[in-house]
Amino acid sequence: LIKLTIKDARLNAGLTQARMSELLEIPKRTIGDWETGTRKPPAYVEKLVIRELERIAEENNSK
């Protein structure tokens, strides 16, 4: 099982960091820090964010 990263999930959803920031109400800088490894979100936050990005990706693919 390959673990999906927040960045992978964001790209799969077709979102920029700025758009993800708007949709999920997470500061853009925080998203950037997570993606570069400068900061690591708590595991539960990472799971919730990835789950939401997967939902957005499914919505976008069904249009």
Task: For each feature predicted by the language model, list its residue ranges.
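Short basic helix-loop element that most often maps to the first helix and adjoining turn
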Residues: 5-19, 48
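Key DNA-contacting residues within the recognition helix of helix-turn-helix
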Residues: 7, 32-33, 42, 50
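Generic low-complexity, intrinsically disordered sequence content enriched
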Residues: 8, 19, 27-28, 52, ...
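Short alpha-helical DNA-recognition segment
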Residues: 14-33
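Short, conserved catalytic or interaction motifs in soluble domains
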Residues: 36
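DNA major-groove recognition helix of helix-turn-helix/homeodomain DNA-binding modules
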Residues: 42-63
